[in-house]
């Protein structure tokens, strides 16, 4: 029996915890049989990264680019399963890999007639697995904590918060902790997607400079700039609180069965 393993997820961002799951799956089912499935759906707060960004992150950690697939629905991933011929499907076991947190997405209840549903947990003995024409299977990957800025981390939302709240040195350290090196390309991606490189203050000062032509106006500009800076910081705090609230809602939203 051959294996086709699909590791679905949002991956905003793809991090060392995800890579640990990928490595575990390759040891269980073979490196050539494991595919990461993710979509290009974006949301500025909870899903900020493009699919191409995720490919950069995953390949930086060692996943072959050909094994990171853009799909419409990661938890079906028909773009991957359709790569097999009917003959291959009849001799291939299909496995979806999820963390314990996401396992509730899957329902192992029997059909109305009492027969087993299509999706089943991976059996203790892999020799008992049926081909994907009869059943699909769900493997629950171990949860792995990793260190970011000297503290344990295990979620993408936690990483996004740390990055947004940090300064330039903090953000470079986070990139190094996540990907092994202070990769400038990945840092630029994070800065852009997480909205931490907006030159708001520079734009405001530039506009003021255009209209300030003499000393009295320059003195007034300095006072206005101080108040504007206070307003900017206030709005940043409000935006940060909103982002944290949206991350909390996303993580605790009931999943469809």
Regions found by a protein language model. Give the residues of each.
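Glycine-biased, low-complexity coil/linker segments
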Residues: 196-223, 229-236, 241-244, 250-251
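Nucleotidyltransferase catalytic core that binds NTPs
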Residues: 1-213, 234, 256
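Long, low-complexity, intrinsically disordered segments
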Residues: 249-257
């Amino acid at each position: 029996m051959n294996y086709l393993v699909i590791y679905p997820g949002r991956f905003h961002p793809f991090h060392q915890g995800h890579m640990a799951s990928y490595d575990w799956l390759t040891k269980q089912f073979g490196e050539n049989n494991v595919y990461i499935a993710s979509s290009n759906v974006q949301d500025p707060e909870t899903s900020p990264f493009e699919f191409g960004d995720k490919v950069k992150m995953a390949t930086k950690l060692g996943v072959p680019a050909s094994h990171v697939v853009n799909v419409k629905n990661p938890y079906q991933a028909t773009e991957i399963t359709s790569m097999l011929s009917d003959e291959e499907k009849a001799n291939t076991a299909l496995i979806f890999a999820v963390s314990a947190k996401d396992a509730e997405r899957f329902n192992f209840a029997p059909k109305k007639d009492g027969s087993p549903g299509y999706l089943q947990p991976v059996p203790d003995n892999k020799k008992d697995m049926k081909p994907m024409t009869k059943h699909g299977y769900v493997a629950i990957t171990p949860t792995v904590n990793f260190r970011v800025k000297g503290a344990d981390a295990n979620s993408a939302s936690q990483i996004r918060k740390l990055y947004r709240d940090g300064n330039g040195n903090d953000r470079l350290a986070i990139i190094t902790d996540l990907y092994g090196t202070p990769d400038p390309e990945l840092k630029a991606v994070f800065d852009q997607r997480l909205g931490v490189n907006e030159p708001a203050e520079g734009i405001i000062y530039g506009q003021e400079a255009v209209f300030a032509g003499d000393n009295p106006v320059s003195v007034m500009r300095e006072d206005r700039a101080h108040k504007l800076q206070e307003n900017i910081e206030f709005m940043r705090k409000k935006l940060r609180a909103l982002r944290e609230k949206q991350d909390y809602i996303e993580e605790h939203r009931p999943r469809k069965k």
